[in-house]
Curated annotation (Swiss-Prot):
It comes from Bos taurus. The gene is DPM3. Pathway: Protein modification; protein glycosylation. It comes from the Eukaryota. Belongs to the DPM3 family. Its main location: endoplasmic reticulum. One of its GO terms (biological process) is protein glycosylation. The keyword Iron-sulfur does not apply. GO terms for molecular function: enzyme activator activity. This is Dolichol-phosphate mannosyltransferase subunit 3. InterPro entries: DPM3.
Length: 92
């Protein structure tokens, strides 16, 4: 099972549980305070997931390491490729 399928299954399970609880399909009579928390729950979860994603990206950008050796190696490979292409008749 792919990761997308796992996420879709989890989303379908959570969504159907939320819908069943809020619409009263299970026959459970939830107190009013629970229903007031349950209705906006998907929006809260979406905002929480967005904050987590933004924090994760920010942390990864802040702790990104420069790879100076790899950059030098890549630059030398580019120079070799340019020299080879120039030798074969390509003009830059």
């Amino acid at each position: 099972m792919t990761k997308l399928a796992q996420w879709l299954w989890a989303l379908a399970l959570l969504g159907s549980t939320w819908a069943a609880l809020t619409m009263g399909a299970l026959g459970l009579e939830l107190p009013s305070s629970c229903r007031e928390v349950l209705w906006p729950l998907p929006a809260y979860l979406l905002v929480s997931a967005g904050c987590y994603a933004l924090g994760t990206v920010g942390y990864r950008v802040a702790t990104f390491h420069d790879c100076e050796d790899a950059a030098r190696e890549l630059q030398s490979q580019i120079q070799e490729a340019r020299a080879d292409l120039t030798r074969r008749g390509l003009r830059f």
